[in-house]
Amino acid sequence: SLTSRNLVATVGADHWHTVVVDECHRLAADRFDTFAKAVRPSVLLGLTATPERSDGQPIAQYFDARPDGSPAVELRLWHALDLQLLAPFEYYACDDATDFSEVPWDRPGEREAVDNLVTGNDVRARLVINEWRRLASDARQSRAIVFCVSVAHAEFMTDWLNRAGLPAACVVGTTASEERRRAPQRLLSGELCALVTVDLYNEGIDLPMVDTLLLLRPTQSPVLF
């Protein structure tokens, strides 16, 4: 990597005329922050579709802005959808009556509190499956990714889907690499109709066969939404 090879120290901070940083919302992470503050190109161009970071750290500090503080060029996802630059989608919100009012949002214990409400919740799991079947012409023919709260929740939902006749595989960080590699192909072939996961397939992945997303974790993040 740029950091491990000490390229800035080796060739000089002003060696590059132009530096392009893709996925520049990652700049606020420690190792990228060090590089961004060390390099001195004539042009530093950052590209991202999700400028908001979940930890709230700003990325504007790394770049020059217009007098009003806005980016040099900005086209948000919702505007790109309006301009038909991205594939359109239909979004359905289904009320499962789960009471999340006591969840400590954006504070320690948030994920654990949500996990306790949804993992093992048979009523909610049954409703999810019924709503999927109601909204899809044929849920078995879907190619879905199911985003869950935790590994335990993913395993719970995988069991429910399989028992309902909707073949699914749980694919999480601890899943064997060969199984993870084969999972998208199994989805494409129709052997599976769902991959159930937690923090995989969030970004930097191209799965054109996917036609359905089930977001089974509540979120206040505009990035995830």
Predicted regions and their residues:
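Switch/connector loops and helix/strand junctions flanking conserved nucleotide-binding motifs
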Residues: 53-58, 100-103, 205-206, 221-225
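Conserved interdomain linker/interface between the two RecA-like ATPase lobes of SF2 helicase motors
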Residues: 69-145
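Catalytic acidic motif of RecA-like/P-loop NTPases
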Residues: 3, 24-26, 202, 220
